[in-house]
Amino acid sequence: MGEKLICNNKKAFHDYFIEERFEAGMVLKGTEVKSLRMGKANLNDSFALVRDGEIFLHNLHINPYDFGNRQNHDPDRLRKLLMHKSEIEKLFGKIREKGYSVVPLRLYFKNGLAKVELGLAKGKKLYDKREDMKKKDQSREMAQALRERSKSH
């Protein structure tokens, strides 16, 4: 069956160094799943926190299902993530260190189940972001120069 991507968090790669990745399941309501199947979700500004040995996803916006009735879900509710206890403890230990946070990188369906890929992230400083942009520009210019050179020959 494979994976079907719902949405990416491109901003996370811009704002953070991703050091480690984890996969987690999500506890969802029926209308949330239907909305996700339609691709109506937004990962921007979302983050995960560990509380009482459980991990929760904050600020994940899933649009209300268009054909839902009064049983429709709250778009910005707290969502519990499903992970092994050892993984949660590992994340909690890292989060307590200064500068680390857990951010969702992408939301997808895997074998029919909604999953979120979490990244253990360390915040980038402004000069790091500038450096990354400079590298990206240089690689783009090199690729463009190579294309132009290959066209002329």
UniProtKB/Swiss-Prot annotation:
Gene Ontology process terms (BP): trans-translation
GO cellular component: cytosol
Chain spans, region Disordered: 129-153
Keywords: Cytoplasm, RNA-binding
GO molecular function, one term: RNA binding
Chain segments annotated as coiled-coil in the UniProt record: none
Main location: cytoplasm
Biological role: Required for rescue of stalled ribosomes mediated by trans-translation. Binds to transfer-messenger RNA (tmRNA), required for stable association of tmRNA with ribosomes. tmRNA and SmpB together mimic tRNA shape, replacing the anticodon stem-loop with SmpB. tmRNA is encoded by the ssrA gene; the 2 termini fold to resemble tRNA(Ala) and it encodes a 'tag peptide', a short internal open reading frame. During trans-translation Ala-aminoacylated tmRNA acts like a tRNA, entering the A-site of stalled ribosomes, displacing the stalled mRNA.
Family: Belongs to the SmpB family.
UniProt name for this protein: SsrA-binding protein
Organism encoding this protein: Geobacter metallireducens (strain ATCC 53774 / DSM 7210 / GS-15)
